[in-house]
């Protein structure tokens, strides 16, 4: 049975993520990390979901039962776990979060001792241990060999200092009014402190988590409220994070949501202007707009494509010796400062770009026009191989004939089919999207 999806393990808490399942997974992961153990410490953080307590306690029980010492740091962004795992010399880091999913879901993400997400072969190795009944039951420790657990509440300061170091030292935010939407999630403490300490005039919304309101009509998936607040307070910028703050959505001074591909383009060129790029390559996923590639080419930069998921962006960046890349969804990686997508690092870089451009954000963050794209997430009941659907191949051939770029795939974390179309003719695009929607509703719903 495959346990890992595109971003760790994710599912409904109490259904897939039961205490027994989580304990078994924790033991399997712990045994895998033991093979390369240097410090016998594992770091655990979480977002603000109510079920995080259950998952955390199950993981602590599992890891201490096989001799690991566990450090619990409470609600923190996913990129903070990646950073602190390496900074605190831990064998591994674990983030308990289902990212942008509703509060009923939860998930578990693993990081190696260097703060990188696990590769697929590492996940497969953990899955093999998970299914090895004899190995699991022979691994419990007794007496003094049982591990310990301690909670540390002040590590947030380390991450805040790290974030501030990512911001250019010759700048401050005193001239900017910024609205932050922390999605009632993991960034609710960190984000306001960072921006306030750098001098910004800060308004914070959705910063009162109650365990059940994470991502609820707020944050990166629902930026309309942020857009309204930016216009209401005449702010210079608005930043919306998702539940674990590895994703960022930007709103300009006019209340417009800045497209992720425009953000990738303008940030890439900004990094180049500072001689901050380690290569001429910038990494984006196959979902990126063709206009991004053309814009980067005009700036003597090359776009490298990879599979969807910030883990694959990171791997492709390492392969191409690149230090900047991301997804149009808002997972953007500045690997000089973060091994995974970090919404806060990205927000600070966007702020610096706007300051140094000496333009309002609606101008500074609008460097090129995009080709028309349409993206829908279709709720489905089943996930048969797409190639097995009668008429599917003919549909793709027709799209190719009409020069409509297409990307159709199942979500790795939810029962959804993602359909992306791109074409120069917007009316044709809308017509074909409706046709595809009806086709898949008839076969999968």
Curated annotation (Swiss-Prot):
Signal peptide range in chain numbering: none
GO biological process: carbohydrate metabolic process; peptidoglycan biosynthetic process; UDP-N-acetylglucosamine biosynthetic process
Modification(s) after translation: Activated by phosphorylation.
Uppermost EC category: isomerase
Residues annotated with Phosphoserine modification: 99
Family annotation (PROSITE patterns): PGM_PMM
Family matches, as Pfam families: PGM_PMM_I, PGM_PMM_II, PGM_PMM_III, PGM_PMM_IV
Keyword presence, Isomerase: yes
HAMAP family the UniProt entry points to: GlmM_B (MF_01554_B)
Active site: 99
Job of this protein: Catalyzes the conversion of glucosamine-6-phosphate to glucosamine-1-phosphate.
A single cellular component GO annotation: cytosol
Cofactor: Mg(2+)
Spans through the membrane: none
Gene field: glmM
Species in which this protein is naturally found: Helicobacter pylori (strain Shi470)
Membership in a protein family: Belongs to the phosphohexose mutase family.
E.C. numbers: 5.4.2.10
Keywords for this protein: Isomerase, Magnesium, Metal-binding, Phosphoprotein
Binding site for Mg(2+): 99, 242, 244, 246
Protein name (database record): Phosphoglucosamine mutase
Molecular-function GO term, any one: phosphomannomutase activity
